[in-house]
A protein has these predicted regions:
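Intrinsically disordered, low-complexity segments enriched in small/polar residues
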Residues: 26, 163, 183, 206-208
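Conserved inter-motif catalytic segment of the P-loop NTP-binding fold
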Residues: 1-80
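Compositionally biased, intrinsically disordered low-complexity regions enriched in proline and serine
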Residues: 29, 94, 186, 209-211
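Phosphate-binding/switch region of NTP-binding enzymes
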Residues: 13, 66, 85-196
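Residue-identity detector for glutamine
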Residues: 35, 49-52, 59, 73, ...
Length: 213
């Protein structure tokens, strides 16, 4: 959804010291708003020719580890809001990319309006907050949700972290679906630090060590 200037602004916020320019790894971002027309990978009748061409292009990247579509609705005109067939088709397309290229394929999607007010640490309750057809979750190997924490938790965490109150600083994250066994479905509290969400437990441990010295 972002154009090139906004992408660079966000990257500078995440990593202001420019160390990323010395990394041995590459990140490629395709800003859809900069193109002459939308990049539609799936329509109601199926995946598009552009979707197939994209996979061929991705094959030219050596040692590819991650492909991310953000957000889903920017790449499809299929009715993923209510059609389980459309949701399953998207899941199959992502699975095909992973199988052919040996990489992880992530899709970023929004929660429904209720997800903004759900105050529960139950991961199965959080699962119902994912917008659209249930197959969007069911067709994936795993699904994570993130939503703002409640006001009381946010106030407490900001105080503990010694920062001014910021309603957007505290997020509840849950693993709500996984095809693997022996996974942790408990909801985790994350704190936004320097533009990056970090597990609160790790920050608390760091603060404890700092206070001791």
């Amino acid at each position: 959804e972002d154009d090139i200037p906004e992408i660079h602004r966000r990257l500078d916020l995440l990593e202001p010291k420019g160390k990323r320019f010395n990394s041995e790894y590459e990140v490629y971002i395709f800003p859809v708003p900069e193109q002459k027309e939308p990049m539609i990978l799936m329509r109601e009748e199926g995946v598009t020719q552009i979707a197939q061409e994209l996979v061929e292009e991705l094959q030219s990247i050596s040692n590819l580890k991650l492909v991310c579509f953000d957000p889903l609705q920017a790449f499809t005109t299929g009715n993923v809001s209510s059609s389980n067939e459309a949701g399953q088709l998207w899941g199959s397309y992502c699975a095909n990319i992973s199988a052919r290229l040996g990489c992880t394929t992530l899709t970023i999607h929004h929660l429904n309006k209720a997800g903004l007010t759900v105050d529960s640490d139950d991961s199965m309750v959080q699962r119902t907050s994912v917008r659209g057809a249930s197959s969007l979750v069911d067709s994936q190997r795993f699904c994570l949700t993130m939503a703002l924490g409640d006001v009381e938790t946010c106030e407490r965490v900001c105080e503990e972290q010694r920062v001014p109150y910021d309603r957007m600083a505290v997020v509840k994250a849950s693993l709500v679906k996984s095809n693997s066994g022996n996974v942790d479905y408990s909801t985790k509290t994350l704190f936004r630090k320097d533009g990056v969400l970090e597990p609160l437990e790790e920050l608390q441990n760091a603060s404890y060590i700092y206070d001791k010295f």
